[in-house]
Design a protein with these regions (language model features):
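Bacterial N-terminal signal peptides that target proteins for export
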Residues: 1-12
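Bacterial N-terminal signal peptides
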Residues: 11-23
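Bacterial Sec-dependent signal peptides at the C-terminal "C-region" and cleavage site
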Residues: 22-30
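Conserved SGNH/GDSL esterase-like catalytic core that processes O-acyl groups on lipids
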Residues: 30-105, 127-135
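Alpha/beta-hydrolase-fold catalytic nucleophile elbow
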Residues: 89, 121-122
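Generic structural signal for well-ordered alpha-helices
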Residues: 103-110, 137, 141
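A short helix->loop->beta-strand "cap" motif at the edges of active sites that frequently abuts
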Residues: 114-118
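Catalytic His-Asp segment of secreted/periplasmic serine-dependent ester chemistry enzymes
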Residues: 126-223, 239-248
């Protein structure tokens, strides 16, 4: 009985080894890291973000009164290569007569983060010397058009249609407005994460003059041959164990 038990345990071990050859371990997915930088609007918005992004690791660096130059500095202070999404909530305190300031700072962030996805809300700010925020929002739209995947939560359009979401100063949101703004930004973050998932899992485009089907076929044949060799070796070991078990009776 002892010899049979020993052989049984060896056989089970070999079978488990065979099964393990075809198994792949999927690492547990880490929570996506989201960096959020901004001004006083973001200070009011950010307390609600975790409610709508419960699975994300949020890093928030927002300082009231900051223009886009200063918010770029906040970005530089906080950015890590492990960040998955960058929310650049800037432009409200920029002079609307010079939309190129925001455009330049957006370009600097993009240069620093590579192909990481960005969320850039549209801007509702004060009119200065008769100039409104059209130029700044055009800069945001042009930036998004030049960079696939960029998400643009429409805060400007939201408060234009629902001005009751703003405080009496006509600039900062009331609590209900701040929560809605957080929802818009969270939707942008989710859009970024979905875009990144689609981008990283999309099949590579075949190169010119390459026969991808034949290449895949040869690879599969080689993998099958290697698997067969390994399985044959393991079965040979099982046969040796069986022979030893029988001879030892």
């Amino acid at each position: 009985v002892g010899r049979i038990g020993s052989f049984g345990r060896a056989t089970v071990a070999l079978l488990l080894a065979l099964l393990a050859l075809g198994a792949t371990a999927a690492p547990a997915g880490a929570a996506p890291k989201v960096l959020v930088v901004g001004d006083s609007l973001e200070e009011l918005t950010s307390p609600y973000l975790s409610r709508y992004l419960p699975g994300a690791e949020l890093v928030i660096n927002a300082v009231g009164g900051s223009n886009s130059y200063q918010i770029f500095d906040l970005f530089q202070e906080s950015y890590e290569p492990s960040d998955s999404v960058i929310v650049f909530d800037a432009g409200t305190n920029d002079n609307p007569e010079y939309p190129q300031i925001l455009a330049g700072n957006l370009a600097k962030v993009a240069a620093a983060v590579g192909n990481r996805c960005m969320v850039v809300p549209t801007i509702h700010g004060f009119t200065v010397n008769g100039v409104d925020n059209t130029g700044k929002n055009r800069a945001v739209a042009e930036f998004a058009a030049s960079r696939p995947g960029t998400q643009v939560p429409d805060w400007a359009g939201t408060v234009e249609s629902s001005p009751q979401l703003l405080q009496s100063d006509g600039l900062h949101p009331i609590p209900e407005g701040a929560e809605l703004r957080a929802q818009l930004i969270a939707q942008g973050v989710e859009g970024c994460l979905a875009y990144e998932q689609a981008r990283t899992t999309a099949p590579a485009q075949p190169r010119t003059n390459v026969e991808p089907i034949a290449t895949v076929g040869r690879l599969q044949a080689r993998q099958a041959a290697v698997m067969g060799e390994l399985q044959t070796d393991l079965l040979r070991q099982a046969a040796v164990l069986l022979a030893g078990s029988l001879l030892g009776r």
